[in-house]
């Protein structure tokens, strides 16, 4: 049945009523008839004589000027603005393939077009030439669906040439997100040095480690070594070399033939890193994959196995795969996008057991896997990461308070003891700046501590640094910029809300704005230049609140609440999980 709309308007002042009738299918039916007339060469008033090049054989297309003008601003201008084509029965057209013009004419009559891998570039070129935006959009959507590591650079280049901003942006985003795969494809090696420098300078590059960018640049140079040798220094300056490890740099200096200038540049960076010289803050790669705050384990009447993630941008929480064994007093950290849960204790109805386990969570599949065990159980442990290795610091096993420290190498899945701290510490806070590991506060079995010490991995030795103004165990500790922030904790009498900041260059402590709530055994991390503290214990209650510190304004804001109150939680930041079957938390 033919669809229509009818509307009766109220009587006008003259007493007449108006009946409005719209036949919805009329336009499509009219164009279908016009298309029949075109195919039968009836009532046509123009012939387009199309050939791609002047020497090619032409192909004639008969059509109606009004239909062409209705679908293309170029044809409309051609036939209505007093141009010579207005009075021509045969209009010569060059620069577009006849098959493409045939498809565009067909679209003008039918509003339908088919594109495939072999023809989409030609059709899109033609649609851009004749400003047929709906066809351009269809081709753009098709090409976005076809993006893969082998063609993304070519599609981005094509989009830039024809001025298709949307396609160019989406292709570039694909390249940034999949840089490591794109960098192995033939198209990557056809980039000019200027294009490559621009690409690797982008903050949005999604790489697990800066070594991936370094290796990509070396491979690009090796592809045509003699021609590309002059560009090595420009590439190295664009790579964030201060994010590389000294061991990696040493291997590259030994195994690759560098020119004198590049060798000196890399050697200087190696010296800066191994001498732990303060450097300007290195801008982090910030891929457009959302970075979430993960909370693992914790204590609320008993140890918990929860893994949850908070998105500070949306305010949403996700419930993820639980730990296999509940743990509190654990620590968390991230290496190459993987979340590690270290040590802790299982406080349960059947008793308490300190843990020497290390578990690794992969956001790509929402799964945990066990890793090599530490040499001893460590409850209320502190951890830090230097050169892609985890340092497990202090903690306790029963009545034993550790000063021992061990280091985990993910590539070998093995632990190695390093020099012990000068002081036994449980409830210790740990942070890393300039490849130096800082252990702050804690409890030695007798006293809460204000002391702090610093570990040098090159020398494998600890040294004392300035003590805090306040004794604290179970404080939240993190590095932000060139400062170490210490938040809350327990002084032996009260839970604290005070905050101290350590200046690594001046070896001195000063107070910052206090938190809104007193907290010990809290979780802490940094996210986009701000500090987040989560949960903890205030002396009476297990807290579910989350506060955020802005160093620019020296102020705290309460931003959200966890699903339930808890203390002794491990907290770290990594990418949003890719697993789709996730459970939103009902907070």
UniProtKB/Swiss-Prot annotation:
- Write down the position(s) of the site called Sensor for electrophilic agents: 119, 241, 399
What is this protein's tissue specificity according to the annotation?
Widely expressed.
Q: Taking every annotated instance into account, which residue ranges of this chain make up the domain BTB? A: 44-117
**Biological processes per GO annotation:** cellular response to oxidative stress; cellular response to prostaglandin stimulus; cellular response to xenobiotic stimulus; larval feeding behavior; proteasome-mediated ubiquitin-dependent protein catabolic process; protein ubiquitination; regulation of autophagy; ubiquitin-dependent protein catabolic process
Does the entry feature the keyword Repeat, yes or no? yes
User: What does the entry list under GO cellular component?
Assistant: Cul3-RING ubiquitin ligase complex; cytoplasm; inclusion body; nucleus
Annotated ranges, domain BACK: 153-253
Outcome recorded upon mutating residue 119 to W: Substitution with a bulky side chain that mimicks covalent modification by an electrophile; prevents ubiquitination and degradation of nfe2l2/nrf2, leading to constitutive activation of nfe2l2/nrf2
Task: Name the InterPro entries for this protein.
Answer: BACK (IPR011705), BTB-kelch_protein (IPR017096), BTB/POZ_dom (IPR000210), KEAP1_BACK (IPR047098), KEAP1_BTB_POZ_dom (IPR030563), Kelch-typ_b-propeller (IPR015915), Kelch_1 (IPR006652), SKP1/BTB/POZ_sf (IPR011333)
Q: How is it modified after translation?
A: Non-enzymatic covalent modifications of reactive cysteines by electrophile metabolites inactivate the BCR(KEAP1) complex.
State the UniProt keywords alphabetically. Cytoplasm, Kelch repeat, Nucleus, Repeat, Ubl conjugation pathway
- The answer to keyword Cytoplasm applying to this record is yes
Control of this protein's activity is summarized as: Ubiquitin ligase activity of the BCR(KEAP1) complex is inhibited by oxidative stress and electrophile metabolites such as sulforaphane. Electrophile metabolites react with reactive cysteine residues in keap1 and trigger non-enzymatic covalent modifications of these cysteine residues, leading to inactivate the ubiquitin ligase activity of the BCR(KEAP1) complex.
Q: Where in the cell is it found?
A: Cytoplasm; Nucleus
Which pathway is this protein assigned to?
Protein modification; protein ubiquitination
One molecular function GO term is: ubiquitin-like ligase-substrate adaptor activity
**Reported effect, residue 118 to T:** Decreased response to oxidative stress
Kelch repeats by residue range: 292-337, 338-388, 389-435, 436-482, 484-529, 530-576
According to the UniProt entry, the note on domains is: Keap1 contains reactive cysteine residues that act as sensors for endogenously produced and exogenously encountered small molecules, which react with sulfhydryl groups and modify the cysteine sensors, leading to impair ability of the BCR(KEAP1) complex to ubiquitinate target proteins.
Family the entry assigns:
Belongs to the KEAP1 family.
Quaternary structure and partners: Homodimer and heterodimer; heterodimerizes with keap1a. Component of the BCR(KEAP1) E3 ubiquitin ligase complex, at least composed of 2 molecules of cul3, 2 molecules of keap1 (keap1a and/or keap1b), and rbx1. Interacts with nfe2l2/nrf2; the interaction is direct.
Q: What does this protein do?
A: Substrate-specific adapter of a BCR (BTB-CUL3-RBX1) E3 ubiquitin ligase complex that regulates the response to oxidative stress by targeting nfe2l2/nrf2 for ubiquitination. Keap1 acts as a key sensor of oxidative and electrophilic stress: in normal conditions, the BCR(KEAP1) complex mediates ubiquitination and degradation of nfe2l2/nrf2, a transcription factor regulating expression of many cytoprotective genes.
Designated name of the protein: Kelch-like ECH-associated protein 1B
* Organism in which the protein naturally occurs: Danio rerio
